[in-house]
Amino acid sequence: MSRHNIGFQVVDRVAQISHISIRTKRFRSLYGTGWIDFQQVILSKPMTFMNRSGEAVKKTTDFFHLGMEDVIVVHDDLDLPFGRLRFKQRGGDGGHQGIRSIIERMGGNSFLRLKVGIGRPPQGMDSADYVLDVFDRTEQSLLDQILSQAAESLKVVLLEGLQKAMNQFQKKG
């Protein structure tokens, strides 16, 4: 999988540890429903092109009668060092085409995001090529730990709140 798919990898890890099957094809997504402790969740992965993710998110939220406050989007972030996690509520798209699509389709930006750092491309490499490239050997060796940490941070958000998750998982710097 490419760096651009790290959000999907986090969702897959949440599904794995929560025993939620993501196999239903609907709303231009693959999704599954289940429970994380006492919190009911819908885990969804848009099956559109990245720059049309908003179509799938909008169809899913409309069907399940969810508001923006019920949505957490997990995505890659070039501006964060590899493996760094950062929660953000509101704000612009930061140049991320998938986030831009979600903001446009949802009609606002107040959904919560978990940004997962993928770092900047090496000197001379195009950003588009970099995000579509696979993780290098060093990154690959750290990926399992990062995915587990990201999945755990989402569980903390759901069960104990955003502030607790930010304090526990968001490193300064």
Mark where each language-model region is.
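Hydrophobic alpha-helical segments within soluble ligand-binding/sensing domains
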Residues: G95-G98
